[in-house]
């Protein structure tokens, strides 16, 4: 059995929180193979899951078990480490090392490259698990000129990288959300954090300008800035009102949703009878979980064809020509875009570099795409349902859990083989971090 320390925001209402719980579920599915310990972390100022359910109760029990172990005074040595594997679900510059095999789990970045700090920390792990090929490419294709003393070298990612996307979920609809009444006959939905990375104001402006005189069309915006607090709600409403004030004669409607919602409640938005399509003007996604949830729920999606979400918005093209293999068909309404440097307010030290680039949607293309989906809804819905069927099969939860399990086992076994080989070569191996620092050297 492999003793695993899972470190991440496992009780946070955030993308990384959901990522942590996905990894947790994957490992807990095989109790005969993985002995799971949990070290919870925060994710910024995001809200925590407060409602009790069987999963959160089990997570809390595993957290308590971990705390008891760490407070027991047990020593962490190479000969007998506390943990065989650590899985750290976070951004790479926060990776720490506390097991024999240390695996990073990250959503990557919205931009076209990762920072040198990310590469340095990633190379200290024994492997990386990312959620999309965009994230993988960001690590594998980014290089920097570096030096150590007089030695010059190319800094690049050298550890193996596995891609494991999220699984689909089957949740019972919320009767409370289904009872929400919208005055408009056709409604778009967008779910995201309000900030420069998600480019929400472009969604808002594009919608209003396209449907300015259409009283039967609405945009449902589920958003937050930092968390689900009342202060966040009212400060964000002021920002939305400032945008709306610039369109005093608009007839289209904006529905602003804010606050704690369960997973079932959120998923019910995607299947609500009065919600017809999902729209995003994101600058980029490591994966794009709300976009994925909308797609596997059968909603037509309007999005730029760039970054993590393209993994699941395309499907194999049906063709009778044998030579045309690996052709993919876009199953969403594509918005034209350009790749350009990130805005100064989006720069995040050690995470988003000032010279990074991401996508900017073309406003005219966004408006046209929304109009096309509304005017050709039957055909667009049929296409979305075809994609839905494909995603439900490809991203079945048991298949994705198995991929996490296989990746952890593979990376751990590869590392053990490397340790043995290094011992035979008289090379020191380190277990470093907050738990202990140890080294092994072959005796002569």
Task: Please identify what each model-predicted range represents.
Residues 1-81, 218, 402:
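N-terminal pre-catalytic "stem/leader" segment of glycosyltransferase-like enzymes
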Residues 225, 335-444:
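C-terminal amphipathic helix plus adjacent low-complexity
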Residues 127-173, 418:
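Donor nucleotide-sugar binding/catalytic pocket of nucleotide-sugar-dependent glycosyltransferases
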Residues 268-286, 296-299:
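Acidic donor-binding loop of glycosyltransferase active sites
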Residues 5-7, 46-140:
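Extended catalytic core of nucleotide-activated donor transferases of GT-like folds
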Residues 5, 180-198, 204-207, 219-221:
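Conserved donor-binding/catalytic core segment of Leloir-type glycosyltransferases
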Residues 229-269, 275-276:
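Nucleotide-activated donor-binding/catalytic signature segment of Leloir-type glycosyltransferases, i.e.
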Residues 300-303, 314, 320-324, 333:
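Short hydrophobic beta-strand element within catalytic cores of glycosyltransferases
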């Amino acid at each position: 059995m492999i003793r695993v320390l899972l470190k991440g925001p496992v009780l946070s209402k955030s993308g990384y929180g959901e990522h942590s719980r996905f990894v947790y579920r994957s490992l807990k599915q095989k109790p005969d193979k993985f002995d799971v310990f949990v070290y919870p972390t925060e994710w910024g100022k995001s809200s925590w899951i407060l409602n009790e359910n069987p999963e959160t109760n089990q997570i809390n029990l595993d957290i308590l078990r971990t705390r008891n172990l760490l407070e027991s005074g047990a020593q962490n040595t190479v000969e007998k480490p506390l943990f065989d594997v650590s899985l750290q679900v976070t951004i790479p510059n926060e990776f720490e090392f506390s097991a024999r095999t240390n695996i990073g789990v990250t959503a990557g970045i919205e931009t076209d490259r990762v920072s040198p700090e990310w590469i340095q920390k990633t190379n200290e792990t024994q492997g990386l698990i990312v959620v999309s090929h965009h994230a993988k490419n960001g690590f594998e294709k980014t290089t920097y000129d570096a030096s150590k003393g007089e030695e010059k070298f190319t800094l690049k990612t050298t550890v193996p990288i596995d891609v494991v996307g999220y699984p689909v979920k089957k949740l019972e609809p919320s009767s409370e959300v289904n009872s929400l009444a919208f005055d408009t006959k056709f409604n778009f939905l967008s779910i995201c954090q309000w900030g420069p990375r998600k480019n929400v104001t472009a969604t808002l402006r594009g919608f209003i300008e396209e449907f300015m005189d259409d009283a039967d069309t609405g945009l449902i915006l589920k958003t937050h800035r930092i968390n689900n607090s009342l202060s966040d709600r009212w400060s964000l409403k002021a920002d939305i009102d400032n945008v709306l004030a610039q369109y005093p004669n608009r007839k289209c409607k904006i529905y602003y949703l804010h606050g704690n919602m369960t997973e079932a409640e959120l998923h019910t938005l995607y299947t609500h009878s009065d919600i017809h399509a999902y729209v995003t003007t994101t600058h980029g996604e490591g994966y794009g979980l709300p976009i994925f949830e909308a797609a596997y729920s059968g909603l037509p999606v309007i999005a730029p064809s760039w970054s993590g979400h393209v993994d699941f918005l395309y499907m194999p093209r049906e063709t009778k020509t044998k030579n045309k293999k690996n052709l993919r068909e876009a199953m969403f309404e594509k918005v034209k875009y350009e790749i350009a440097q990130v805005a100064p307010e989006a720069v995040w030290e050690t995470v988003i570099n000032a010279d990074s680039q991401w996508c900017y949607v073309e406003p005219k293309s966004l408006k046209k795409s929304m109009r096309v989906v509304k005017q050709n809804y039957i055909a667009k819905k049929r296409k979305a349902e075809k994609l839905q069927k494909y995603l439900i099969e490809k991203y079945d939860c048991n298949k994705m859990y198995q991929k996490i399990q296989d990746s952890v086992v593979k990376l751990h076994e590869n590392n053990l083989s490397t340790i043995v080989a290094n011992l035979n070569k008289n090379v020191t191996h380190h277990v470093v971090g907050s738990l202990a620092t140890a080294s092994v050297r072959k005796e002569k």
